[in-house]
């Protein structure tokens, strides 16, 4: 079984659509192996998104991700990385296919409701960032 990391971002948490988003994952055959609601510190967000450190949007991204609570989850299933990315839709909700999470729940390319690992290797690193092995079952 493949695992991937999903983050329900502050805009979606604030809108109260956590359950609706989780339902999308479960309806698509992804199982929640671990989940927790947390408030990221600036340090945590900066470390997690370090790959974007030199990009112009980095500071805005860190500010956004620390603006409210997030829900981090380990999703598990066949082709979990690809399946999650398909469910999320395009990064820009205006370009996301109808029926995807971002098309239905996101407001902008910045406040785009969810994060999902983009590869199996990144999924392993991202999961390890948020979860100890004993937290995943």
Curated annotation (Swiss-Prot):
UniProt-listed SMART domains: NDK
GO molecular function terms attached to this record: ATP binding; metal ion binding; nucleoside diphosphate kinase activity
Presence of the UniProt keyword Magnesium in the record: yes
Major place of residence: cytoplasm
Active site: 115 (pros-phosphohistidine intermediate)
EC number: 2.7.4.6
TM region(s), chain numbering: none
Co-factor requirement: Mg(2+)
Residue numbers binding ATP: 9, 57, 85, 91, 102, 112
Broad EC category: transferase
Example GO biological process: UTP biosynthetic process
A GO CC annotation given for this chain: cytoplasm
Record field: catalytic activity: a 2'-deoxyribonucleoside 5'-diphosphate + ATP = a 2'-deoxyribonucleoside 5'-triphosphate + ADP; a ribonucleoside 5'-diphosphate + ATP = a ribonucleoside 5'-triphosphate + ADP
Domain of life: Bacteria
Similarity annotation: Belongs to the NDK family.
Function: Major role in the synthesis of nucleoside triphosphates other than ATP. The ATP gamma phosphate is transferred to the NDP beta phosphate via a ping-pong mechanism, using a phosphorylated active-site intermediate.
Subunit text: Homotetramer.
Protein name: Nucleoside diphosphate kinase
Organism per entry: Campylobacter hominis (strain ATCC BAA-381 / DSM 21671 / CCUG 45161 / LMG 19568 / NCTC 13146 / CH001A)
Gene: ndk
